[in-house]
Amino acid sequence: MYKLVLIRHGESTWNLENRFTGWVDVDLTDTGAAQARLAGKLLKEAGFAFDVAYTSVLKRAIRTLWHVQDEMDEMWIPVRNEWRLNERHYGALAGLNKAETAAKFGDEQVLVWRRSYDTPPPALEPTDPRASYDDPRYANVPREQIPLTECLKDTVARVLPLWNESIAPDIQSGKRVVIAAHGNSIRALVKYLDQISDDDIVGLNIPNGTPLVYELDASLRPLRHYYLGDQEAIAASLAAVASQGKAR
């Protein structure tokens, strides 16, 4: 049996302000850093150790991984920073307050933009300063692969090649893998692993800074999965994530 650990980054500054973030490179709050440290402590106490780590190229996920590694005394393990693990791109919604956007467009429309499988938000113009074409962290990414908006289907399309080419082979070679990423890149992986339908994925939320453990068989099919931590606190965190896109 293999184990895989997925961790959404701790609370970010724009999580706190209830803003659509996407590829904007915001940092953790003090609460987010504490969540990440607690995740590392829980993993260490549960006997986990890792051989390789994956994360995105956005600092909220990178710093979350640092805190986890620090708590586990595993700062030395190899880390792969992969743009394909970035949060989904929220297009022209980036920076907007979710509740204010819901008040303007309606809860239902914002829920579709946030959680539906195949409906992207309005795209950025290529000349928009929020576009990532000139960002040095994407210098080796073909321009046509750098998004101006994404739906979850698009996120799945960029995450799964990384899974098939790198992550899955690492796991099957016996390496113990941890992935610190984002709500929607993790939803993309969970959708694939658990074979969640396009309709049912709308209801899936991922809490900040909470280790999600998958136990996998030899073919990497899930045997079970569970969150580490206080289950009441996790339920409250999930409810908070679900309510972010509603008008106040």
UniProtKB/Swiss-Prot annotation:
Pfam families: His_Phos_1 (PF00300)
HAMAP family given in the database record: PGAM_GpmA
GO molecular function: phosphoglycerate mutase activity
Organism whose genome encodes this protein: Cupriavidus pinatubonensis (strain JMP 134 / LMG 1197) (Cupriavidus necator (strain JMP 134))
Keyword rRNA-binding: no
Source taxonomy: Bacteria, Pseudomonadati, Pseudomonadota, Betaproteobacteria, Burkholderiales
Function: Catalyzes the interconversion of 2-phosphoglycerate and 3-phosphoglycerate.
Residues binding substrate: 8-15, 21-22, 60, 87-90, 98, 114-115, 183-184
Keyword annotations from UniProtKB, A to Z: Gluconeogenesis, Glycolysis, Isomerase
Name of the featured protein: 2,3-bisphosphoglycerate-dependent phosphoglycerate mutase
